[in-house]
A protein has these predicted regions:
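Post-HEXXH active-site segment of zinc metalloproteases
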Residues: 63-67, 79-113
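Short, polar/charged, Gly/Pro-enriched helix-capping and turn/loop motifs at alpha-helix termini
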Residues: 26, 83-84, 129-133
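Catalytic zinc-binding patch centered on the HExxH motif and its immediate surroundings
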Residues: 21-62
């Protein structure tokens, strides 16, 4: 088996599309953006903004990449479930609550914790599937 150093652009796109469709948020647009964070789900535009650091993905970055994409997909799922405006209000309320409790508005935010758990819990499943499909 040949070990590829980089994941092709086509394979990366196929993985993202598969994940979005599976979790029934296929209408989410994906765009690369220069940013400090790995990714961000822009609830106002319904766009998953992916850091340009993921323009090319090394095989050693697949775990981090899958966790990141799944994390942001969870936010998209919440926005679909509650409606984007209500989800944005709920998220901001949670941020303000954490600040009032002198906690970190991101790391202690229940929506971030749930999204991170989602990514951590499902990345292996998708890693196995994408390996079988020879996408990674």
């Amino acid at each position: 088996m040949l070990i590829r150093e980089f994941i092709s652009e086509a394979n990366k796109s196929q993985m993202i599309t598969t994940l979005l469709k599976h979790y029934k948020v296929g209408n989410v647009r994906v765009k690369l953006k220069s940013m400090k964070n790995h990714a961000h789900y822009n609830v106002d535009t319904g766009t998953l903004e992916l850091s340009t650091r993921y323009k090319t993905i090394k095989s050693s970055q697949v775990k981090e990449f899958l966790i990141t994409i799944l994390h942001e997909i969870r936010h998209a799922m919440d926005a679909k479930k509650y409606g984007w405006k209500k989800f944005k209000d709920m998220y901001e309320y949670e941020m303000n609550l954490m600040i009032a409790k002198d906690k970190d508005e991101y790391k202690d935010n229940k929506f971030e914790i749930e999204a991170e758990d989602f990514g951590q819990n499902y990345w292996k499943k998708w890693n196995t599937r994408f390996k079988k499909e020879e996408l990674i």
